[in-house]
């Protein structure tokens, strides 16, 4: 299940296509939450001229928990809950790359069925997209309704000291050097 998402093309007014309530406005391309804004209804709609991107997506803001699953060599590793630090509105660029800007709870404390569903969906997305070596899929989880939503698959997940994939690998007793070796070996099979 995916959140309701609308495409907003260059020249279209944002106010014409928005959802009632909260939603996420983000560029169609890019990464690391660059250009992402949380919109809290009609009164907080930014001017489209504020964005350097031509095409945007308006995605319904769903769930209360942000989750992620790394798949390494066709095997999902674990589910991590990502929490932005108190001084961050959401898991934005700073929260991803600066120390002490986010908290990673590993493994995520969600019902077993939802945990297994996240692992299964991440593996399925990895295979459908044709990923080799590594991918990381992001989810939102609605605790009240016990509903998992898939947001996206990252085909080149971060590999910094604050990145989620190396942390998940380490949790599964896979060192960074071993993880990199697996990624290289998987890529070399395609050559």
Feature roles, as predicted:
Residues 8, 36-41, 71-73, 142, ...:
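Short beta-strand-to-turn element immediately C-terminal to the catalytic PLP-Schiff-base lysine
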Residues 147-191:
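C-terminal active-site "lid" helix and adjoining low-complexity regulatory extension at the edge
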Residues 40-114, 148-149:
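Phosphate-binding site of ATP-dependent enzymes
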Residues 51-55, 97-144, 183-186:
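A long amphipathic alpha-helix within ATP-dependent nucleotide-binding catalytic cores
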Residues 60, 69, 126-159, 169:
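Conserved metal-phosphate-binding beta-hairpin within the catalytic cores
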Residues 18-20, 73-74, 143-148:
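A short, glycine/Asx- and small/polar-enriched loop/turn
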Residues 1-65:
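Active-site nucleotide/adenylate-binding loops and adjacent lid/helix of ATP-dependent enzymes
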